[in-house]
Amino acid sequence: MTERDFDTPVETPTVQPAPAQGAKPAQTVPVVAVVLAAGFGTRFDPDNPKQLVSVGGKPIVCWSIDAFEHCDRVSDIVVVVNPKVRGEVETLVGEMGYTKVRVIIDGGDERVDSTATALDMLATAGIPDDAKILIHDAVRPFVEQSAIDGSIDALDQFTAATVAYASTDTVLLTEDLGDLKVVKSVPDRPNTFRAQTPQSFRFATIRHAYDLAAADPDFHPTDDTRVVVDYLPDEPVAIVSGAETNLKITTLEDIPTAERIAEEILGRDPKEEARARMHALLAQAAGQMHR
């Protein structure tokens, strides 16, 4: 797939009509969704890449791309893939006619490597420092539009934000004592959240954090928020309300839960059900290519 130009702000007249009541303000900078689909899932079925597994008649990666494609405020999408499934993902993207997917690129060995690769590509493409970058795990297929909108809005006040879901369980922080783990502290439950995605940043902020991290030989974070928290500790990271349904599909045991969520979504939206049937046909063809 050839790379297409990223959207840039269009000069607007000095006088503009007031937005309709309840309407979101017009974007003045690019809003770029980076969909990370490069993991191969060692805890999943090694012979069946989970990005291409069909849930509710639609490949997991397509659920995630759809969420950003259908958000009017997102201007561009970058998909980061494992080279082994690049052809299949390109086929799905091409057949579905996604208009916002600008480029599909190969990711790295680890999640942070894939993010770093995407940031390098965006810098080369000339993305402005104040662009809003939403980084999302492709294997969280049921992200809600409210979480995407909330992430975009949060970046008007902060330079970093993450979708998170309030923990309903007490969380224990532990330390090693001999061969066992023991409780070190118990944080107050109202202050504990389960990190989800998208994790969102102004481009200059996340780029600077990754530049600092790259110089650290002990750099081993598991997500992008951790990079900002560790390397730019003076930058507050806003919490955007997530949902229990925004689950990460990690093992085969997660599929039945995902199917139930998909069934509920499809039951609410007949148009989504029609799209899912089309996706199912394309996923079947892509699966045959993978074999």
UniProtKB/Swiss-Prot annotation:
Pfam families: IspD. Keywords: Isoprene biosynthesis, Nucleotidyltransferase, Transferase. GO terms for biological process: isopentenyl diphosphate biosynthetic process, methylerythritol 4-phosphate pathway. SUPFAM superfamilies: Nucleotide-diphospho-sugar transferases. The gene is ispD. Pathway: Isoprenoid biosynthesis; isopentenyl diphosphate biosynthesis via DXP pathway; isopentenyl diphosphate from 1-deoxy-D-xylulose 5-phosphate: step 2/6. PROSITE patterns: ISPD. The record marks 43, 50 as: Transition state stabilizer. It catalyses: 2-C-methyl-D-erythritol 4-phosphate + CTP + H(+) = 4-CDP-2-C-methyl-D-erythritol + diphosphate. The lineage of its organism: Bacteria, Bacillati, Actinomycetota, Actinomycetes, Bifidobacteriales. Residues 1-23 are annotated as: Disordered. Its EC number is 2.7.7.60. The record marks 189, 248 as: Positions MEP for the nucleophilic attack. PANTHER family: 2-C-METHYL-D-ERYTHRITOL 4-PHOSPHATE CYTIDYLYLTRANSFERASE, CHLOROPLASTIC. One of its GO terms (molecular function) is 2-C-methyl-D-erythritol 4-phosphate cytidylyltransferase activity. Catalyzes the formation of 4-diphosphocytidyl-2-C-methyl-D-erythritol from CTP and 2-C-methyl-D-erythritol 4-phosphate (MEP). Belongs to the IspD/TarI cytidylyltransferase family. IspD subfamily. InterPro entries: IspD, IspD/TarI, IspD/TarI_cytidylyltransf_bact, ISPD_synthase_CS, Nucleotide-diphossugar_trans. This is 2-C-methyl-D-erythritol 4-phosphate cytidylyltransferase.
